Amino acid sequence: LKSGRRIPADLAVIAIGVRPHVDWLRSSGIEINRGIVVDEFQESSCPDIYAAGDVAETRHLLTGERSVVAIWPEAVNQGRVAGWNMSGRVVSYPGSLPMNAVEIGEKALVSAGIVNPTDDNCEIIIKKDRENYKKLVIKDDCIIGVIFIGDIEKSGIYINLMRQKLPVQAFYEKLLEPNFGLINLPTQYRKHF
């Protein structure tokens, strides 16, 4: 580490992320921060100029803060919204949700949302065994963070609950049970899946 401290490990995974290539636009009149700043319609500060994907700086779905979330699913969603708005159909983008899915060795890993909250009002639920690790971060009765290592099969359910900001109180006790699935969700929630 910078401090000179050493941390022994069998494996270290380091990722530096993505930095949008936007320097060439700085004198264009388009508002640039870390990326091209866009509104909820993916429109830049210059009327009729839209941005999406790795160069777009959007609102974070959960915090509302501006950020660049350079991942394929968000690029697709942003591109759709930008395209609809360019064609005259008014559609707003709900915000970006950071997430990753990787395989390290033979272990699958999915993380999404706010996985290491600094807010004391968050509840963290962890269920683990020798092969699997599952962590949910809950705030105000909604999932705001997910980490699954090993068995990631149903992680999409949790990520969609988070994306839709659906309260989990009605099925809270079953959240990390092995047989948890769509059947455990209230009927009115299932339309979101």
Regions found by a protein language model. Give the residues of each.
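Mid-to-C-terminal Rossmann-like scaffold of FAD/NAD(P)H-dependent oxidoreductases
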Residues: V55-K154
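An exposure/low-complexity boundary signal
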Residues: Q78, N85, G181-F193
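C-terminal auxiliary extensions adjacent to catalytic cores
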Residues: D129-Y189
